[in-house]
C-alpha cells in the first residue's frame, strides 16, 4: 500500500506571484540572540562544498530565465527565499544583470528547484551525497 500524500493540480513554482502584487519586506537586522548573520548560520549548518563541482546549474534551455523572467517579472525571488543566499545578481552593468550562483553556501533545502519561476535550476545531489535526493 502506498503512503498517503497531498495531490496538487499544479507545480509549486506556478504559485509564485509576480512583483506587481507585493511590497518589499524590511527585515530587522540579526540580534545575535534569536537571529544571526548569514555567515554564522552557514557555519552551524555543517555543509561543506570545498573543491566540489557545482550541484546547482541553470538548465540549458532556460538560460534566459534568470535575467529576463525572474528578475524583470518576479523581482528575483531566489535572492530572498534561499536561506543561504546562494543566488544573487551582479548589478555592475545595470542594463544587464547577471545571476551569480554561490553553490558553496547551499544548505540543500531544494527550495530553488521547487519554487523558482520556470523551474530553471537543475539541482543534483552534491558529491558525498549531502542533502535531499
Please place each PLM-identified region on the residue numbering:
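Flanking scaffold residues of small Cys/His-coordinated metal-binding clusters
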Residues: 73-77, 101-111
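Short linker/helix segments within small regulatory modules
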Residues: 93-103
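Ferredoxin-type iron-sulfur electron-transfer modules and their immediate structural context
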Residues: 1-95, 114-133
Amino acid at each position: 500500500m502506498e503512503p498517503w500524500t497531498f495531490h496538487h493540480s499544479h507545480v509549486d513554482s506556478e504559485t509564485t506571484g509576480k512583483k506587481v502584487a507585493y511590497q518589499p519586506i524590511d527585515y530587522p537586522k540579526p540580534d545575535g540572540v534569536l537571529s544571526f548573520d548569514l555567515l554564522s548560520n552557514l557555519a552551524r549548518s555543517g555543509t561543506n562544498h570545498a573543491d566540489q563541482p557545482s550541484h546547482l546549474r541553470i538548465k540549458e534551455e532556460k538560460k534566459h530565465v534568470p535575467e529576463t523572467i525572474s528578475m524583470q517579472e518576479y523581482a528575483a525571488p531566489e535572492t530572498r527565499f534561499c536561506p543561504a543566499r546562494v543566488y544573487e545578481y551582479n548589478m555592475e552593468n545595470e542594463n544587464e544583470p547577471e545571476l551569480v550562483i554561490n553553490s558553496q553556501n547551499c544548505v540543500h533545502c531544494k527550495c530553488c528547484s521547487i519554487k523558482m519561476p520556470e523551474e530553471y535550476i537543475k539541482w543534483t545531489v552534491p558529491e558525498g551525497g549531502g542533502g535531499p535526493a
